[in-house]
């Protein structure tokens, strides 16, 4: 089967899908919180911003 080679090229005007592997449509920060929570790890937060997704650094 023959087809034009141009069909394999991407258009420069075509927007890049930034979070292609992000199935839940989360931004990178939300995705990181989700992954760290799933791994049982939490980020360090500065009080009074401490909550369930992080632990207090100070």
UniProtKB/Swiss-Prot annotation:
It comes from Conus pulicarius (Flea-bitten cone). Pfam families: Conotoxin. One of its GO terms (molecular function) is toxin activity. Keywords: Cleavage on pair of basic residues, Disulfide bond, Secreted, Signal, Toxin. GO terms for cellular component: extracellular region. This is Conotoxin Pu3.6. Residues 1-12 form the signal peptide. The cysteine framework is III (CC-C-C-CC). The lineage of its organism: Eukaryota, Metazoa, Spiralia, Lophotrochozoa, Mollusca.
């Amino acid at each position: 089967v023959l087809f034009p080679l141009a069909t394999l090229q991407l258009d420069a005007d075509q927007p890049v899908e930034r979070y292609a592997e992000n199935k839940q449509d989360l931004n990178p920060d939300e995705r990181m919180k989700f992954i760290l929570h799933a791994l049982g790890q939490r980020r360090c937060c500065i009080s009074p911003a401490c909550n369930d997704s992080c632990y207090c650094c100070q």
